[in-house]
UniProtKB/Swiss-Prot annotation:
Gene3D superfamilies hit by this protein: PSTPO5379-like, PSTPO5379-like domain
Protein name as catalogued: Putative hydro-lyase Rpal_1947
Family to which the UniProt record says this protein belongs: Belongs to the D-glutamate cyclase family.
One Gene Ontology term of the molecular function aspect: lyase activity
Known EC number: 4.2.1.-
Entries under Pfam families matching the protein: D-Glu_cyclase (PF07286)
Ranges in a coiled coil: none
Keyword entries, A-Z: Lyase
Regions crossing the membrane: none
Keyword DNA-binding assigned: no
Broad enzyme group: lyase
HAMAP family the UniProt entry points to: Hydro_lyase
Family matches, as InterPro entries: D-Glu_cyclase, Putative_hydro-lyase, UPF0317
């Protein structure tokens, strides 16, 4: 597991970090997509499981680092993850959550205080929103940000390596790009292996099991121009699919596109 130390900098209660401001907004009830929120700061997907299943899920993430790169993990029963942020409370600091029972989605609350238990372990998994900042800095347009919608995500026929009860296909996120931008995007995102890295597929969505690219399994559809290619990255929503398939008695995840904003800096995730 790779856990990055939170950015060390002075914190003034009157001038909180943009990332902390984002979490406080969520705590106050804001429930919107976090794409483009708090530029420069790492965002994460969330998976919360009973301790009984935590070791197997951790192993699943280790075996599948492209869709499931761990950037932080809580102690058992502790909703605070200080390595990821000041005053970060996993129960309140995301815009919206999903509560699962026996593999079925039963609720989508804006906080999980009433659902928290002493046996729960929270995993924060890297999110492609982190490398989007680098793409934008390279003048590569990102359609879902332009359209102000959630990134489209799809179940594929790409199998993940199983671990314990957890198995299933990879989920991918898609961004339409012109060929020259797609080539540059490969180069840019290869520098960020801890937030999914380079694309796993370009073009021909049918070859990875996507029957209709206009109908994403998660998120929102975006237009694809006639001179553009769909570019697919491994996605941190993959754990939701495998947790649902495993039918564990109880689990909590984030709502797709509504992420945890941490105090980690995107620039510190780059390897080159």
């Amino acid at each position: 597991m790779t856990v990055f130390a939170a950015e060390q900098q002075f914190h003034d209660a009157e001038r909180p970090l943009p990332s902390h401001q984002a979490r406080l907004a969520c705590r106050a009830g804001l429930a919107e997509t976090t794409a483009g929120v708090a530029p420069g700061f790492v965002q994460g997907n969330l998976a919360i499981l009973p301790e009984k299943y935590a070791a197997a899920f951790h192993r699943f993430c280790q075996l599948n680092p492209k869709p499931c790169p761990i950037v932080g993990m809580s102690d058992v029963g502790n909703p605070m993850i200080p390595s990821l942020g000041i005053d970060l409370d996993i129960r309140t600091d995301l815009p919206r959550y999903r509560v699962w029972r026996d593999g079925e989605l039963v609720e989508e609350p804006t906080d999980i205080v009433a659902h928290w238990r002493d046996d729960l372990v929270a995993f924060v998994i890297g999110c492609s929103f982190s490398f989007e900042e680098a793409l934008l800095a390279d003048d590569i347009p990102i359609r879902h940000i332009e359209e102000k919608v959630r990134v489209p995500m799809y179940r594929t026929n790409i199998p993940c390596e199983p671990a314990g009860p957890f198995s299933g296909p990879m989920v991918v996120s898609m961004r339409p790009l012109k060929p020259k931008d797609a080539i540059r995007a490969i180069q840019v995102t290869s520098r960020f292996p801890s937030v999914h890295g380079a694309p796993v597929h370009i073009g021909l969505p049918q070859s990875i099991g996507i029957a209709d690219i206009a109908k994403p399994d998660y998120g929102d559809p975006v237009p694809i121009g006639p001179d553009e290619l769909p570019v697919f990255w491994a996605c941190g929503v993959t754990p939701q699919a495998v947790i649902a398939a495993a039918k564990v008695p109880f689990a909590i995840t984030h709502a797709p596109g509504l992420m945890l904003v941490t105090d980690l800096k995107n620039k510190h995730l780059a390897v080159l």
